[in-house]
């Protein structure tokens, strides 16, 4: 691996967006098929992977000196790349602090630590400003965030933290801290008992269908269903642990939660 790396393959969205924001996009030679931020990435960079699968021969043909991955879900891809002699850095950020640390670490990896620190600091200030607007709110709506529908899976930790910053109460904040998605699987009775005022869906790449949620057995009595407060947030702006979640994702949450005041 050369330093700083000149040919980077990004197998998740957030490192792509971060490198563009740092002005280091010229280093990217391949991206995840889910990468959509900024829009030009779909035109300019070859796609080499889904999330849990990748075209390793295609990656190898790009002659990367560094591949960036995320979480244990890409462990098999990492194994194959390492066995092929490729340098890999696996990120595993699960909360806001981890997202900001990822930005700083990625900046260090590509030789622009000062720019990365400035970006992370500006995002942290933005979060603080948003938090200030909800401090002391007389009412904080109860929010159920659904990341997947079959089985029902509630939001991961950074989403839970963003709900709090946006002025809501995550009804499954305790589950959000689970180390794996299996710890966030819910039964319908869990949601019914939690009585959320708002349901926010982001079904990880497929369209959220409020009518399908409202029609679940027992959901007719859920406050969010009674007042038709079911909303979608597109996955690219909330489920990738990077700048998008801390900006557009947070803004969308704030707009949704504000409707319940």
Question: In which residue ranges do the predicted regions lie?
Answer:
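N-terminal ligand-binding lobe of clamshell/alpha-beta domains
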Residues: 1-261
């Amino acid at each position: 691996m050369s330093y700083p790396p000149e040919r980077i393959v990004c197998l998740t969205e957030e490192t792509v967006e971060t490198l563009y924001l740092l002005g280091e996009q010229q280093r990217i030679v391949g991206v995840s098929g889910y990468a959509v931020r900024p829009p030009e990435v779909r035109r300019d960079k070859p796609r080499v992977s889904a999330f849990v699968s990748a075209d390793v021969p295609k990656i190898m043909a790009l002659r990367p000196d560094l591949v960036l991955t995320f979480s244990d879900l890409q462990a098999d891809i990492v194994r194959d790349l390492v066995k092929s002699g490729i340098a890999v850095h696996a990120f595993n950020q699960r909360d806001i602090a981890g997202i900001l640390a990822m930005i700083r670490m990625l900046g260090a990896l590509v030789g622009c630590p000062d720019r990365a620190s400035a970006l992370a600091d500006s995002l942290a200030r933005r979060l603080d400003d948003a938090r200030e607007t909800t401090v002391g709110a007389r009412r904080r709506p109860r929010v159920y965030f659904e990341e997947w529908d079959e089985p029902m899976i509630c939001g991961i930790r950074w989403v839970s933290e963003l709900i709090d910053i946006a002025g809501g109460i995550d009804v499954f904040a305790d589950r959000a801290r689970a180390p794996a998605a299996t710890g966030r699987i819910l039964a319908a009775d869990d949601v019914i008992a939690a009585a959320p005022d708002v349901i926010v869906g982001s079904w990880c790449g497929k369209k959220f269908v409020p009518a399908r949620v409202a029609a679940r057995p027992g959901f007719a009595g859920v406050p969010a269903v009674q007042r038709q407060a079911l909303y979608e947030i597109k996955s690219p702006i909330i489920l990738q642990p990077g700048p998008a979640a801390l900006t557009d994702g947070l803004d969308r949450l704030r707009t949704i939660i504000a409707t319940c005041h």
